[in-house]
Amino acid sequence: MYLSKVIKQDYNDNGYAIIRSVIEPDLVEEVQKHVEWLQNKYPKIRPEAFHHDLLVDDPFIHELLNNQDMLDIIEMIIGPNIALFGAHYIAKRPKDGKPVGWHQDGSYWPLEPMNVVSVWLAGTESLKKMVVCV
């Protein structure tokens, strides 16, 4: 229970919370393999463009998005009424790929109250200078 209060407080105070090792290493490896599979299936699509339209009927992405450990943490922040508005991979190769510009995800979903989270799962290690800026 203490952890849930710390996570929620971090999120409320800072607008984000960093929670490490949420999903098991085996599942991280499956995510990496899934991205590779998508790259082979859609060779003309850049990996940072693997968006909702390619994933909506994908069984693996549904398994990933229903990961109970991840859902438990989301519930700690916004409560039990969780809805998914979209899912995509931002798969970037080292020293390649377009940047994701500054934005606020909340502007895409005009909800009241704005009780929303965006979940980013890192599938590989990232250099400190290459991570999300908040």
Task: Name each region found by the language model.
Residues 98-134:
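Catalytic core of non-heme Fe(II) oxygenases with the double-stranded beta-helix
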